[in-house]
């Protein structure tokens, strides 16, 4: 989930399939569709021409069947086909593979390290499943998101696609713990950098001049893929996006086993702050947001739990090293403002604290809500819309009580100064024993 904090236009509905014609069209590869594709043959009892007189045997025209088209399944738009049916052998695409360099170069060919890596087949299959879901959903979303849509339409369109492709609608108790959405979809506009998703009743509409960070996660059995991108329709922001994308790729390149966090942060800051952006005749240096970090990812724990590590995006600080077997979200944030974020606006993101104290709860609403959270989300982050979707109502008092008792954490939106613009790009990387895998890498970013 995004960041870890250091200290008149027609709507394009992401949930639609292009109108009634598309809705009634038979699915590719369906029996109905295949029957239509094998047309052009005569019925034995109809339309067969006679030769000779009436006593002669009737000759029937030979059937000429068209060859059936090879209809391998492809993903729909919007994405709605469960991914396991597109990859029936559970062989999901691997991410970008990068061999270790310098003193770790031996890992690529070392037989012991290769053996350790082969022991991680289930781990890798689950991560690659989640990563391919993320790629397919985001690549459609990048085409479909347009000015004039509400933030609720955008967020829910992405979430419905994730639920469909993982095969986990999340409405039955425990279903979302097996797979699906890893944390609320962030749709963060302009000076808001992270942790914003619409609550019920939100009417905010995406405008042409907005810069929107889209941050969403997918998990399979708690293996979380966390990746984010930024959308801007006005080319005036191109340099801002380029700066942050460059910084993220620099961080990914630097990351590896035994690499110090401080060295990664210094490289990220140098790359990002070599850019500037001109807006309405004024040049702004792109600043790394110094109190936002990348982070380790644990199973069912987006920020790595109590032993989690942070990946800074500015120089100085932590001398901790990355280690073999760790999973990281490498994310960077750039801003035309101060390069520092604060809590602002209405909270929507929450998560149960993994090692929360066993506090006696006096409010029955808090007890009941904690039971719902535990059985449906565990320690995965959730938002108010997800509670609404499960049929919960009048839960705010109980939710605030859980926060006050240190059982649930609240994650308010994180914002720079109003009038500034922020951008974000993020990937999940696996530090495998013999190679580094950028698991969420795609053709888009």
From Swiss-Prot:
Keyword Zinc recorded: no
Domain of life: Eukaryota
Subcellular location: Cytoplasm
CDD domains: MetAP2
Compositionally biased tracts (Basic residues): 57-71
InterPro entries: Creatinase/aminopeptidase-like, Met_Aminopeptidase_Type2, Pept_M24, Pept_M24_MAP, Pept_M24A_MAP2, Pept_M24A_MAP2_BS, WH-like_DNA-bd_sf, WH_DNA-bd_sf
Region (Disordered): 1-76
Required cofactor names: Co(2+); Zn(2+); Mn(2+); Fe(2+)
Binding sites annotated in the UniProt record for a divalent metal cation 1: 215, 226, 426
Keyword presence, Metal-binding: yes
Enzyme Commission number(s): 3.4.11.18
Biological processes annotated in GO: proteolysis
GO function terms (MF aspect): initiator methionyl aminopeptidase activity; metal ion binding; metalloaminopeptidase activity
Gene Ontology CC terms, in alphabetical order: cytoplasm
Annotated positions binding a divalent metal cation 2: 226, 295, 331, 426
Role, per record: Cotranslationally removes the N-terminal methionine from nascent proteins. The N-terminal methionine is often cleaved when the second residue in the primary sequence is small and uncharged (Met-Ala-, Cys, Gly, Pro, Ser, Thr, or Val).
Recorded family membership: Belongs to the peptidase M24A family. Methionine aminopeptidase eukaryotic type 2 subfamily.
The protein's name: Methionine aminopeptidase 2
Originating organism: Paracoccidioides lutzii (strain ATCC MYA-826 / Pb01)
């Amino acid at each position: 989930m995004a960041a870890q904090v250091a200290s008149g236009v027609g709507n394009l509905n992401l949930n639609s399939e292009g109108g009634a014609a598309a809705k009634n069209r038979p699915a590719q590869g369906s029996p109905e569709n295949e029957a239509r594709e094998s047309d052009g043959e005569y019925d034995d009892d109809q339309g067969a021409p006679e030769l000779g007189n009436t006593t002669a045997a009737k000759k029937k025209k030979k059937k000429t069947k068209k060859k059936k088209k090879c209809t391998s399944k492809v993903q729909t738009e919007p994405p709605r086909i469960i991914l396991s049916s597109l990859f029936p052998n559970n062989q999901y695409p691997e991410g970008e593979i990068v061999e270790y360099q310098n003193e770790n170069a031996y890992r690529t060919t070392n037989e012991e390290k290769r053996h350790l890596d082969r022991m991680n087949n289930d781990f890798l299959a689950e991560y690659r499943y989640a990563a391919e879901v993320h790629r397919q959903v985001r690549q459609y979303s990048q085409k479909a998101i347009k000015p004039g849509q509400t933030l609720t339409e955008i967020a829910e369109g992405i979430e419905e696609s994730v639920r469909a492709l993982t095969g986990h609608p999340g409405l039955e108790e425990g279903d979302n713990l097996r797979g699906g959405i890893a944390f609320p979809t962030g749709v963060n506009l302009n000076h808001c950098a992270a942790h914003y998703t619409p609550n019920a009743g939100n009417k905010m509409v995406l405008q042409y001049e907005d810069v929107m960070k889209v941050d969403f996660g997918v998990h399979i059995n708690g293996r979380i893929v966390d990746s984010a991108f930024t959308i801007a329709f006005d080319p005036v922001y191109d340099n801002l996006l380029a700066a942050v994308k460059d910084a993220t790729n620099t961080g990914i390149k630097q990351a590896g086993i035994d690499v110090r966090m401080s060295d990664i942060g210094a490289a990220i800051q140098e790359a990002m702050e070599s850019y500037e952006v001109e807006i309405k005749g004024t040049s702004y240096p792109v600043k790394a947001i110094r109190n936002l970090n990348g982070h380790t990812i644990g199973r069912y724990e987006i920020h790595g739990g109590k032993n989690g590590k942070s990946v800074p995006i500015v120089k100085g600080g932590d001398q901790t090293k990355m280690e073999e077997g760790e999973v990281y979200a490498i994310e960077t944030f750039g801003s035309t403002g101060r390069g520092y974020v604060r809590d602002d606006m209405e909270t929507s993101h929450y998560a149960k604290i993994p090692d929360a104290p066993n506090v006696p709860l006096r409010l029955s609403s808090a007890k009941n809500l904690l039971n719902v959270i535990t059985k449906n989300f565990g320690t995965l982050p959730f938002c108010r819309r997800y509670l609404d979707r499960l049929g919960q109502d009048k839960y705010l008092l109980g939710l605030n009580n859980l926060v006050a008792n240190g059982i649930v954490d609240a994650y308010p939106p994180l914002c720079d100064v109003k009038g500034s613009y922020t951008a974000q790009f993020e990937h999940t990387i696996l530090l495998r024993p013999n190679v580094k895998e950028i698991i969420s890498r795609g053709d888009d970013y």
